[in-house]
Structure formats: C-alpha cells, structure tokens
Regions:
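Conserved active-site motif detector
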Residues: 1-121
Length: 121
C-alpha cells in the first residue's frame, strides 16, 4: 500500500506545566506518542523531546491522533512559533502525519470535522 503524508496546524498544550524543562525553538522537531499511563485522559497523546514529555496534543483532537498512531501511522511535531496564552500556555506547531494513503485521507477528514465542530459549538 502507498504511503502519504499530511500536515495539521495546531498547538502543543500544557507548556505552563513543562516550561522549566523545555524552551521551545522555532523549527524544533518533537516526537508524538500515545501516553498509555495518563490517569486523567485515556486518549492522551504526548509531545516529547528526547523521550521526556514537554506537552500534549490538544484534547479536542487527541482521540483522532491516538487512532491514527494505533493503526500504524507516525506523527511528528514541528514548532512554528513562540508560546502564547490559550488553554494554559500553548506553543504553535504543525503536526506531520505519515501513513497509508487511505488512513491519511480519513484522518484529515476527521480532524477537519473535529476542529470545525469546536469552532461552531
């Protein structure tokens, strides 16, 4: 099966918690993985630098990210701006998805629906 890639502009959430261990730099690439032992959110997806959690994928889209990773997809995060206030301190980024063509198309549709629903609710 053919592989594809896609990008999704968003943020890394929770920088206010991790700011003592991480100073984000524009262009920095970070790992994204399912956080299986998160007692507060069973869909949590963490953003990591050198295997240390420095933030999380926004809760509104974490379930979609988790499904993508569970089905063999890969996600990386690239910092695109300076931290700002939002839900705590947020760091602007682009999430890079890599996986099977069919799954990429489905994930991007789900992300579009998820974020559209949030904007209008």
């Amino acid at each position: 099966m053919d592989m594809s890639s896609a990008n999704f502009e968003s943020v890394v959430r929770g920088h206010h918690i991790y700011k003592s261990i991480w100073n984000p730099a524009v262009g920095e690439r970070l790992d994204v993985s399912i956080e299986r032992d998160n007692a507060h959110d069973r869909y949590a997806v963490s953003v990591q630098r050198d295997s240390v959690i420095v933030g999380h994928v926004p809760r509104e889209v974490a379930k979609v990210f988790k499904a993508f990773i569970t089905h063999g997809g890969e996600v990386a995060c690239e910092v695109t701006g300076r931290r700002k206030r939002g839900n705590g301190l947020e760091v602007p980024c682009v999430y890079h998805f890599k996986g099977k063509d069919k799954i990429i198309v489905g994930i991007m549709q789900l992300l579009k629906l998820t974020t559209a629903n949030k904007m209008y609710s």
